[in-house]
Amino acid sequence: MSELCYIISGTGYTRCHSSFYQDNAVEKEKLNDIFKKVNQLTNHKFGALYNACTESNFGKRLMEFDAFSTIHADSGGLQIVTQGAEITEKLKNDVYHNQAKYSNLGMCFDEIPVTVADGRSSRNDTSGRIFDKDNFHVYAENTGKNLLDQINVFDK
C-alpha cells in the first residue's frame, strides 16, 4: 500500500510560530499532539511548507514540532517577482542557507520564460504575461545554475 505525505501550506495559520506556543511548553506540546493525531488517522504522513524568503523564521520553529515528517521550504521567487522586486544573488544565497538548515526539501529559484508587460503581475493574473520562446534556453541555463548553487549550499 502506498504511503502519502500531506504537506500543509499556509503554516502561519497554525500559529505554531507565535510567541504563544514558542514561550509556552505546555501549549506547544498540545499543538504538537494535534499534529501527531493527524498522523495516526490514516495511512499518511504529515509535513509542513514554509516560504524561506518571506517566512525565514518559520523553519527553525517548525523543526521544534516532531510530528512533522518533513519540512519543505519554498524559495519565495514567485512572491518576489509578483511584487516587482528583484531576486539578487544575496537573496538567493540567504534562502538556500535557510533551506539547508531548516528543511528536508528546498525548492529552487526557477527562471520562468515569461515577460510581464508592465514589470509587475499578481500571482494569479496571467493577462499581462508573455511566453519568451526566443530566450527559453537562457532561462533554462539560469535555472540550472540556480540548482547547482543551491546544491552546493546544501552539500556544505
Descriptions of predicted regions:
Residues M1-D155:
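Non-catalytic, usually N-terminal nucleic-acid engagement modules in DNA/RNA processing proteins
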